[in-house]
Amino acid sequence: MKLLYPTSLKLDPKLLEGFGASLQSYNVKEKIPEEHTDAEVLIAWCNSPNNLKDAASRLKNLKWIQSLAAGPNDVLNAGFDPKTIAITTGSGLHDQTVAEHTLGLLLVSARKFHLMRDSQMQGKWPGSLGGPQPDKEPGTFNTLSEARITVWGFGNIAKQLTPWLRALGADVKGIARSAGVRDGVQVYSEDNLSEILKETDALVMILPGSDSTKNALNAERLKLLPKHAWVVNVGRGTCIDEDALNSALDNGEIGGAALDVFATEPLPESSPLYKQKNVVLSPHAAGGRPRGAEGLIAENLRRFLAKQELKNAL
């Protein structure tokens, strides 16, 4: 059995020895070499769309794809058929890093670090941001203490993030497809979204990309947020109507936005988001380092050889 692993991941092949597999590295930006098209297992991480499409058409013996991304979109969009090929994701590998980045974006937004940096680059002292400041003033978002944080898309990343937010005094609510209490957090169904948005200081979006979530945050829902509220998106860029977001920012309908993902990446230079004063942009940097990848690959390889159910299978 041949297993292809990507050069985009710093992986010690010795960790996968002992399974009786032939381990071969491959370049995720180039076509799979002809001598490796007989592979039965493909590990995917940061593959180019052309690489995956090529693999989908030429790897006729493929039986299992282990993607290290949190979701399967890239693999499915390339044309791999989940009915004939086992597809597993890297769900859980990015929880801590994305949660950490999200916390950072929230702190930057609340404490106005972005404005301080802007002044620094202009050689100016941002005096209005220092000295005596009102604390927890109604109609503002300047601290996480007692801030009303709504997490839309309450999965594993949210469960990692919530204890950190609560440690800083935030009041956390969740929005998901089904209501309930998860890890001590009250999670509401999307039927309650309108009411929850009206009482939100910062909306954290961790939604997956799909037809059902496209432009989930649209003009109508943006108008429900308080004028001081910030939007933080670390899920998928397609979940926000960027034209509506820009309009809301221009008209002062929301306080600002901290975005790590975008409908088109890289974000085009023509995007007005670059010039918005109260916008913080990061280049899809929240994840990018799948922690525990070797362990997941080894465990699923063991299960695959034993014909057991794979972890994170579609």
Model-derived regions: residue spans:
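Short glycine-rich, flexible loops that bind phosphorylated cofactors or substrates
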Residues: 49-52, 73-74, 211-213, 239-240, ...
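Hydrophobic Val/Ile/Leu positions in short beta-strands of Rossmann-like dinucleotide-binding domains
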Residues: 5, 149-151
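Short beta->alpha connector loops at strand-helix junctions that form conserved
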Residues: 68, 86-93, 235, 284
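An N-terminal-biased, well-structured beta-alpha scaffold segment characteristic
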Residues: 1-88
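Rossmann-like adenosine-cofactor binding region
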Residues: 173, 178-272
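Adenosine-phosphate binding glycine-rich loop
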Residues: 268, 276-295, 299-304
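Hydrophobic/small residue at the entry helix of a nucleotide-binding pocket
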Residues: 157
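Phosphate-binding beta-alpha-beta segment of Rossmann-like dinucleotide-binding domains, i.e.
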Residues: 85, 90-148
